[in-house]
Amino acid sequence: MVRLFWNTHNQINNNTNNKKNAADHLWGIYHKENSNLWIKEILKGVEYSITESEKNIENGDVLIIVDSSIEKKIEQYKKLKLICSKIFLFHLGDESALHDLTDVYKNFDYVWRTFCHNKYFNSKLVQCIPVGYKSGVSDKKIASKKYKWAFIGTPHKSSRHDLLFQLSSIKENFCHKTEQFNKKIISVDTMSEVLSSTEFLPCPNGFVHPETYRVYEALECGCIPIVENAYKYYDRLFPNNPFIKIDKWSEAKDLVKDWTGDQIIKKQKECKIWWDKYKIEIQNFIGKKIN
């Protein structure tokens, strides 16, 4: 039997007096709440049952583990490897890639991980996948777009402040700024409504890594992502992608202000076709690896 086991919220040594362990526990809960529908979508090519406990895993099962803070769990993986006929990992988080995970990953038949780094781009054991969209974000299919651009997030870096400075004069726009990650956020339904009503979504780099949820939420909701071209990250992750890429936000200002309706509609369609095709390709690849 193929079983799916979410393990992100089950943290080893969950001592809340230890700040690192407490943070890992909170991140594990966050991943389960916010990435479950993305993982479900990319696993469409696999028939599986969900197990809530490793106690339900039986000898000979094919196991798919979704996990984070994996550097702490190598003994658990070694034990499961002895029981299962095959074992696969979806590794969430790990933006900074601080740990050498060679000894962890070798317990698995194959690994998919978010937040790609140089050593994983050409790996035979590991494939990088998008961080995906937040669970519940969906296209409201609003034809007439109310906003030229939108920003939803924390302006924690100079690049983000420059983004807001450059684009603030362009109306109409929607701007929801938070002081801290995941604090005073808008609901996913409101976000879906806003993004589905927006033409362009500037997607600045994340705090540690270039990738963020916003790129994929833009694609899900039919608006055009504008990404920073740092290290040509998105071209390495997605060759021939249709994203608009800029080196500085003043370039985005001219583009958002000057693009005509036909240009916008053409790029929206291009992004939608590419994203739908990409998701089918990753579903097929995962299905072939696991089945």
Question: Residue locations for each model-derived region?
Answer:
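Acidic, PIN/NYN-like endoribonuclease modules and their adjacent C-terminal/linker elements
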Residues: 240-259
